[in-house]
Amino acid sequence: AEREIVRNIKEKLCYVALDFEQEMQTAASSSSLEKSYELPDGQVITIGNERFRCPEALFQPSFLGMESAGIHETCYNSIMKCDVDIRKFLYANTVLSGGSTMFPGIADRMQKEITAFAPPTMKVKIIAPPERKYSVWIGGSILASLSTFQQMWISKQEYDESGPSIVHRKCF
């Protein structure tokens, strides 16, 4: 039951700040960002900077004690591992998918962060389809049903022998 309450708070009240430090300053100096939430027992709690501090862990995993890159940096690193000839298409067609991308503000923040990493003249476009909560599952099921999909499979041995270039060779 507690997990459901937290999930409900996350889905109804949380958002990704475009500028985390600025948002922290705003939250510290005024109550404009605070929202009330009624618990099942009728108790009313106030949610303040937690509204954007929790999703910030997607961009700064160190908030959770993790030593890993945020989603923006992981996305950039993935693009940089691809063949140089297709990078501009990846920058211009980055699609958000999955439940954790449903936070309001996440597309604008990804746009800002990836633009900061990308070459200055690069066009960066983040696409956030409204149905993205289930798009991972839907896309996977469509891909698995294609008759041509099996020829795109890559074994660990193939990847170990060829590295990331095997993906480009087999899938494009």
From Swiss-Prot:
* InterPro entries registered for this protein in UniProt: Actin, Actin_CS, ATPase_NBD
Q: Where in the cell is it found?
A: Cytoplasm; Cytoplasm, Cytoskeleton
Segments spanning the bilayer are none
Keyword ATP-binding tagged: yes
Q: Which Gene3D superfamilies does this chain map to?
A: 3.30.420.40, Actin, Chain A, domain 4
Q: State the top-level EC class.
A: hydrolase
Q: Give me the reactions it catalyses.
A: ATP + H2O = ADP + phosphate + H(+)
Q: What does this protein do?
A: Actins are highly conserved proteins that are involved in various types of cell motility and are ubiquitously expressed in all eukaryotic cells.
Full protein name: Actin, cytoskeletal 3
Where does this protein come from, organism-wise? Lytechinus pictus
